[in-house]
Regions:
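N-terminal secretory/targeting leader peptides
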Residues: 5-15, 23-118, 127-330
Length: 330
């Protein structure tokens, strides 16, 4: 039986046909891509995916995971998967899927989840299936699992414990309009500043705060200028494990089944890894005296202020049915 061999380099992808036929005895090779090194949670999730596919398929198959952005960045990975060349599987931010689905970035929006338990329930209940279906139809890229789990909090140059203290707080937010709208609704004064300028902006009192996951706070050393971490838990990341639909259609049925099963399980594994590492990093930074975690007492009240903005945003992008189900899930 002749099987497909996936192109293993960008140079080859540019000149080769979508696939080449291999010797009947040669096992299939699938290519993955990730921006990070082996220590990152995304790598660990994709390696688990490979391990599980081998387990469930039970036949010879090879995987090549291209690390450290050697095949570009996540935006390029998604484009390659849509085209059926160079990259067969990856973990990609929903923001890079917006060309094909207006609702895609919504699944990574702020104030969508009540807490980590609610986030996990939403993913386990497969409430994001309409978004996945739209992306599969329009981009021919399958969302076979959901990793992520980094919780974003506000790092500030002063303690912030409630809505009164957070009122008027000048905080850097991401460029997507929904971030400024929701933070304004919560009473803050959001400002869009380039990520690599946040440290100096806080140091020079242009802003008083920013928001990120523990890994970002650690890597950028934001704790040096903003050592107070308000535990707002305003966003919990979702990072889909993606698989090229064009590649998937060429696979034998038993391998397709293995890919689907492995994707779901690897996503759950990735969520556990990232959420636990998030906590470990916070504990380590706090123990070393780099930052202090500050409980935020008005988390529920803040979400109540933001919910109408999120509801309007969901309706605007055609995700109102999904939003209603997420809010209703207990």
């Amino acid at each position: 039986m002749k099987r497909r061999t996936i192109v293993t380099s960008l140079a080859a992808a540019a000149v080769a046909a979508p696939f080449v036929k291999a010797n009947a005895q040669a096992p299939l090779t699938l290519n993955g891509a990730v921006q990070f090194n082996d220590d990152h949670a995304f790598n660990k999730a994709l390696l688990k995916f490979e391990e599980l596919v081998k387990k469930y398929y039970g036949k010879p198959i090879n995987f090549v995971l291209h690390r450290n952005s050697s095949l570009g960045l996540e935006k390029q990975y998604f484009e390659y998967m849509a085209q059926g060349k160079a990259v067969d599987y990856s973990i990609v931010s929903p923001a890079h899927m917006s060309t094909f689905s207006k609702a895609a970035p919504f699944i990574d929006a702020p104030f969508l989840f009540r807490d980590l338990a609610h986030w996990n329930k939403v993913l386990d209940a497969d409430l994001l299936k309409p978004v996945a279906d739209e992306i599969a139809q329009k981009a021919d890229v399958m969302l076979i699992g959901y990793a992520g789990g980094g919780t974003r909090n506000i790092f500030a140059n002063k303690p912030v414990t409630n809505l009164t203290e957070i009122k008027g707080l000048k905080v850097r937010v991401q460029g997507a309009p929904i971030w400024s709208k929701t933070f304004s609704a919560a009473g803050m004064a959001p400002t869009v500043i380039a990520y690599n300028e946040v440290y100096n902006a806080i140091q020079n009192n242009v802003i008083a705060a920013g928001e990120n996951e523990a890994a970002g706070v650690e890597t950028m050393k934001f704790y040096e200028v903003a050592p107070h971490l308000a535990m707002t838990e305003h966003a919990i990341t979702i990072r889909p494990i993606c698989f090229s639909g064009k590649t998937f259609k060429t696979l034998p049925k038993d391998l397709q089944d293995a890919v689907i099963k492995a994707g779901k399980e690897a996503g759950a594994y990735g969520r556990q890894i990232e959420s636990s590492e998030d906590e470990q990093k916070l504990v380590a930074m706090e123990k070393s005296g780099k930052l202090k975690r500050v409980p935020f007492k008005d988390r529920a009240a803040m979400k109540k202020l933001v919910d109408p903005v999120m509801e309007a945003y969901a309706k605007e992008i055609g995700a109102d049915a999904i939003f209603s189900k997420i809010v209703a899930l207990n």
